[in-house]
């Protein structure tokens, strides 16, 4: 029994024994069975080892089976094991290690006793072994046998050593199926009472994770039912509480959710995202009157805050916007008050409350329209809002019809300009020059069309009453030319200096008519006006006459083709045919016959052609001021086409006297046309000086003044058939000389020709594209292109050499090379 006493002492004092405790079990399996320690052995190895371990460790299991059958104490001990398995968790492995060190020596000391053969001590120390040593060995065997279950259960909770033992229950069920199932409910009750605080807290923690979700789900279901019952109430409260009910609603949410303690913040976030609409009606149903009183106490507070801020405003913008801020706060406060009253009522009354909101917002606007007393009106003027902006903007806001009036005025001006837009602009622009002394304000200067014509002078012009634009232009020309003739009788030299300020086409008409009546101011004015009237009356019929494109140079033909929007054509005949077709399609077919009749009648009387050619061109050029090429082309055809009707108009005074009388001044009817002839020639000389770029038709008559002066006393019909043909030859030579003298620089012409070339393809780029891509330009190819095609696009007849192109390229930094 001394050894047994030693065993009891060792089990009660585990602190000294761990020094010698690892030595005994380390020798036992090595000496007796030559086996590794049981922790490293696998589960199939245990079945043979248990046969050999009867004397040491397996003896206790064998002793238990008869003790269970014989004694009543033993069935109470394994349920203690089951209670430990069901109640405790595995996570406190740190607590297991000191217990193993304290309780393993007891088992090892018992093995020593087993060697001595004391079986009675095992039965006497059975309650101690069941409480201390047997529990730990069951734990160690459970850990050795099923480590996977131990690791899985250990991660869930680490408060106790108990969760390593539910797998042991299954093992014990396999070994002893009859004894275990009836003992489970009793063991569960005993374990809750024995184990104490740790078990209770662990069970609550395991229950809290799932049932808390169930509790929240129940609140959600109840709140959803309430929402389903009171949807209009919640919707109205949501709309009404956007303004100032955020504080009260947030506090109500905190009140509903403040019972759960540590998870306040999380549940507030969930309520804000999911249950925002449902929590409010629940809180209103619980605390109807209390919340309305709280909201009424809290809602006047935001009224006071903006009032304090309005007193602190010092800036101009703050003062201007203060009224709007007050109105917005008042509107929101009134709406919040109505929502609090609507919460007390039923759903129908709440919908009516929403209608009352709209009425309440409209009610403060009604007294603004009431007629005020003079004092109140003066006060309202003092409190009037400041409006920033220019007066022009305010005028346009006050007069919305100004745009309509302006559009109507523009449309009226466009009606006159539909057929011929240029004559209107020319006449309107000519009015300030003829009335140069009139005062001109900024408005008169600024009120102009896109073409530069004055908008407001459409009403001032005397010709507004005339319905047709053609008649209007003729009447303007007649009235102005008559005034100009009357002025020219008094001061002839000053008018040409004043008139160039207007458009250049007017230069030809007015001075030509002004210098006619210089010797006899009375009678010639009538004839000049008659001539002008004859020409203007004829403009309706012979105005669109086809020019003689055969007399044009290649450069002029190319310009005409380009003006119609066609690409340049190399062949001269093709260009002439194309221009004729374009002109016929634009002006009509009936005019071509007039050109033929005019060309046949030119042989009868060429000298009056000189008299009438300039006024005709002057009347036509303002109509075609868009392009100077067309004016030149039409002025060329005037000597061939215009004379026959004018000869008929002038045959009454001068047909009998021109052939018979050699002297010019024999009769009073004849001198004005003769003097007009000489004056017209002088005007042509002056035009050469004023016009910077003379055309072929204008230069055609430059060598004529001496010839015509010599031919004037002679009969007019003698030189008519032979005169026009040599003129064309001389004019071509003289024209080429003058063009060569006044042609622009050839380098600029090359640059223009290069830009005039149409865009090429990626395989064959244009010369300009090659230069942009820094491709080396072969001088010979570039020269051949310029001489054959390029310079013809610009109307240049000169040719270019490769050496000149090399200088041109080097001066502009263009990469070039010879072939």
Swiss-Prot record:
Subcellular localization(s) per the UniProt record: Nucleus
Pfam families membership: Slx4
Keywords: DNA damage, DNA recombination, DNA repair, Nucleus, Phosphoprotein
Domain of life per record: Eukaryota
GO CC annotations on file: Slx1-Slx4 complex
InterPro entries tied to this protein: Slx4_ascomycetes, Structure-sp_endonuc_su_Slx4
Modification(s) after translation: Phosphorylated in response to DNA damage.
GO biological process: DNA recombination; DNA repair; DNA replication
Subunit structure as annotated in this protein's UniProt entry: Forms a heterodimer with slx1.
Annotated family: Belongs to the SLX4 family.
Protein name: Structure-specific endonuclease subunit slx4
Species of the source: Aspergillus oryzae (strain ATCC 42149 / RIB 40) (Yellow koji mold)
Recorded name of the encoding gene: slx4
């Amino acid at each position: 029994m001394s050894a047994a006493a030693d065993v009891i002492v060792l089990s009660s004092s585990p602190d000294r024994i761990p020094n010698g405790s690892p030595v005994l079990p380390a020798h036992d399996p090595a000496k007796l069975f030559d086996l590794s320690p049981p922790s490293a052995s696998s589960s199939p190895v245990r079945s043979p080892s248990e046969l050999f371990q009867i004397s040491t460790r397996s003896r206790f299991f064998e002793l238990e089976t008869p003790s269970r059958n014989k004694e009543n104490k033993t069935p109470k001990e394994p349920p203690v094991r089951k209670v430990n398995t069901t109640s405790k968790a595995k996570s406190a492995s740190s607590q297991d290690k000191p217990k193993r060190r304290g309780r393993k020596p007891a088992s090892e000391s018992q093995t020593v006793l087993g060697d001595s053969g004391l079986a009675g001590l095992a039965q006497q120390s059975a309650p101690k072994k069941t409480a201390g040593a047997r529990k730990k060995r069951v734990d160690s065997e459970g850990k050795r046998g099923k480590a996977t279950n131990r690791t899985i259960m250990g991660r869930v909770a680490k408060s106790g050593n108990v969760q390593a033992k539910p797998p042991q229950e299954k093992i014990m069920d396999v070994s002893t199926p009859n004894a275990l199932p009836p003992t489970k409910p009793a063991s569960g009750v005993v374990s809750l009472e024995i184990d104490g605080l740790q078990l209770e807290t662990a069970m609550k923690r395991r229950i809290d994770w799932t049932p808390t979700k169930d509790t929240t789900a129940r609140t959600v279901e109840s709140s959803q039912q309430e929402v389903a019952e009171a949807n209009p109430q919640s919707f109205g409260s949501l709309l009404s509480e956007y303004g100032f009910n955020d504080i009260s609603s947030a506090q109500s949410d905190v009140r509903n959710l403040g019972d759960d303690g540590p998870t306040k913040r999380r549940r507030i976030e969930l309520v804000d995202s999911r249950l925002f609409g449902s929590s409010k009606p629940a809180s209103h149903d619980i605390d109807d009157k209390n919340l309305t009183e709280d909201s009424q106490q809290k809602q006047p507070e935001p009224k006071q805050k903006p009032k304090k801020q309005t007193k602190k405003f010092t800036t101009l913008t703050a003062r201007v916007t203060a009224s709007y801020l007050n109105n917005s706060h008042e509107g929101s406060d009134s709406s919040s008050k109505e929502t609090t009253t609507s919460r007390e009522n039923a759903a129908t009354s709440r919908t009516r409350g929403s209608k009352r909101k709209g009425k309440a917002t409209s009610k403060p606007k009604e007294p603004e329209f009431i007629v005020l007393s003079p004092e109140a009106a003066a006060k309202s003027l003092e409190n009037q809002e400041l409006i920033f902006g220019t007066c022009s903007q305010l005028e346009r806001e006050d007069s919305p019809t100004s745009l309509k009036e302006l559009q109507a005025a523009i449309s009226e001006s466009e009606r006159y300009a539909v057929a011929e837009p240029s004559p209107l602009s020319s006449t309107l622009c000519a009015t300030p020059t003829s009335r140069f002394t009139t005062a001109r304000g900024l408005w008169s200067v600024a009120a102009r069309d896109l073409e530069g014509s004055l908008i407001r002078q459409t009403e001032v012009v005397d010709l507004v009453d005339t319905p047709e634009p053609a008649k209007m232009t003729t009447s303007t020309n007649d009235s102005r030319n008559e005034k100009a003739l009357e002025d020219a009788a008094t001061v002839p030299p000053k008018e040409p200096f004043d008139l160039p300020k207007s458009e250049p086409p007017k230069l030809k008409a007015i001075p030509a008519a002004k210098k006619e009546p210089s010797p006899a101011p009375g009678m010639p004015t009538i004839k000049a006006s008659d001539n002008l009237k004859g020409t203007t009356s004829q403009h309706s019929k012979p105005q669109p006459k086809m020019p003689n494109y055969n007399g044009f140079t290649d450069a002029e033909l190319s310009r005409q083709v380009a003006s119609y929007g066609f690409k340049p054509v190399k062949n001269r005949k093709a260009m002439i045919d194309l221009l004729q077709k374009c002109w016929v399609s634009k002006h009509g077919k009936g005019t071509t016959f007039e050109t033929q009749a005019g060309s046949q009648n030119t042989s009868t009387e060429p000298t009056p052609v000189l008299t009438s050619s300039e006024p005709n061109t002057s009347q036509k050029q303002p109509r075609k001021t868009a392009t100077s090429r067309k004016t030149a082309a039409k002025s060329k055809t005037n000597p061939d086409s215009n004379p026959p009707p004018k000869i008929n108009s002038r045959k009454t005074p001068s047909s009998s006297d021109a052939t018979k009388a050699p002297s010019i001044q024999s009769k009073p009817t004849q001198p004005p046309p003769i003097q007009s002839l000489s004056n017209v020639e002088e005007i042509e000389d002056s035009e050469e000086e004023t016009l910077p770029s003379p055309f072929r038709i204008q230069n055609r008559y430059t060598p004529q003044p001496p010839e015509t002066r010599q031919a004037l006393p002679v009969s007019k019909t003698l030189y008519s058939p032979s005169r026009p043909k040599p003129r064309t030859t001389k004019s071509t030579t003289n024209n080429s000389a003058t063009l060569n003298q006044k042609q622009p620089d050839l380098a600029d012409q090359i640059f223009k020709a290069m830009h005039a070339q149409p865009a090429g393809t990626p395989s064959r780029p244009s010369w300009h594209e090659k230069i942009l891509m820094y491709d080396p330009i072969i001088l010979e190819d570039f020269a051949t292109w310029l001489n054959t095609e390029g310079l013809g696009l610009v109307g240049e007849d000169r040719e270019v050499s490769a050496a000149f192109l090399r200088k041109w390229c080097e001066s502009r930094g263009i990469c070039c090379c010879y072939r």
